[in-house]
């Protein structure tokens, strides 16, 4: 990597005329922050579709802005959808009556509190499956990714889907690499109709066969939404 090879120290901070940083919302992470503050190109161009970071750290500090503080060029996802630059989608919100009012949002214990409400919740799991079947012409023919709260929740939902006749595989960080590699192909072939996961397939992945997303974790993040 740029950091491990000490390229800035080796060739000089002003060696590059132009530096392009893709996925520049990652700049606020420690190792990228060090590089961004060390390099001195004539042009530093950052590209991202999700400028908001979940930890709230700003990325504007790394770049020059217009007098009003806005980016040099900005086209948000919702505007790109309006301009038909991205594939359109239909979004359905289904009320499962789960009471999340006591969840400590954006504070320690948030994920654990949500996990306790949804993992093992048979009523909610049954409703999810019924709503999927109601909204899809044929849920078995879907190619879905199911985003869950935790590994335990993913395993719970995988069991429910399989028992309902909707073949699914749980694919999480601890899943064997060969199984993870084969999972998208199994989805494409129709052997599976769902991959159930937690923090995989969030970004930097191209799965054109996917036609359905089930977001089974509540979120206040505009990035995830």
Region locations from a protein language model:
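Conserved helix/coil segment N-terminal to the catalytic DExD/H
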Residues: 1-18, 29-34
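Switch/connector loops and helix/strand junctions flanking conserved nucleotide-binding motifs
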Residues: 53-58, 100-103, 205-206, 221-225
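A short beta-strand element within the Helicase C-terminal
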Residues: 16-17, 193-218, 224-225
């Amino acid at each position: 990597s740029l950091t491990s090879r000490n390229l800035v120290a080796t060739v000089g901070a002003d060696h590059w005329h132009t530096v392009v940083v893709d996925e520049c919302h990652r700049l606020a992470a420690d190792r990228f922050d060090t590089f961004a503050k060390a390099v001195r190109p004539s042009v530093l161009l950052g590209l991202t579709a999700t400028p908001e970071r979940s930890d709230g750290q700003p990325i504007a500090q790394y770049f020059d802005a217009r007098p009003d503080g806005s980016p040099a060029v900005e086209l948000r996802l919702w505007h790109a959808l309006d301009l038909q630059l991205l594939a359109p989608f239909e979004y359905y919100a289904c009320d499962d009556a789960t009471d999340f009012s006591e969840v400590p949002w954006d504070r320690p214990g948030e994920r654990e509190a949500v996990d306790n409400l949804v993992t093992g919740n048979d009523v909610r799991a049954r409703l999810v499956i019924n709503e999927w079947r109601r909204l899809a012409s044929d849920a078995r023919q879907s190619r879905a990714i199911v985003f869950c709260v935790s590994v335990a929740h993913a395993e719970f939902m995988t069991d429910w889907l399989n028992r309902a006749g909707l073949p699914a595989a749980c694919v999480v960080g601890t899943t064997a690499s060969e199984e993870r590699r084969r999972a998208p192909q199994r989805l494409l072939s129709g052997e599976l109709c769902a991959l159930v996961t937690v923090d995989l397939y969030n970004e930097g992945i191209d799965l054109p066969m996917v036609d359905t997303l089930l977001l089974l974790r509540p979120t206040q993040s505009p990035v995830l939404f």
